[in-house]
């Protein structure tokens, strides 16, 4: 994501986007992307998640504790 792109403009998030949004480490983000129930997909070796799937996942897991 370049400096002029905002979250509102993105429709697909990368590992780095999720790291920044959730304020988690790269290691934690990779564990999350590889966990069951996290609706991500791969393009080649790169992990991605759609904005709508990410928002739905966040809302449906509100209040839950994750050990990643």
Q: What is each PLM-predicted segment?
A:
Residues 21-48, 55:
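Major-groove DNA-recognition helix of helix-turn-helix-type DNA-binding domains
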Residues 54-68:
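A short, Lys/Arg-enriched interface patch at domain edges and termini
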Residues 1-5, 65-68:
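Short intrinsically disordered terminal tails
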Residues 2-28:
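Polyanion-binding surface elements
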């Amino acid at each position: 994501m370049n400096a002029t792109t905002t979250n509102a403009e993105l429709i697909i998030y990368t590992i780095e986007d999720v790291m920044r949004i959730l304020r988690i480490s790269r290691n934690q983000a990779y564990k999350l992307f590889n966990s069951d129930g996290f609706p991500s997909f791969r393009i080649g070796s790169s992990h991605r998640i759609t904005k709508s799937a990410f928002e739905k996942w966040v809302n449906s897991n509100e209040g839950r504790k994750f050990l990643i």
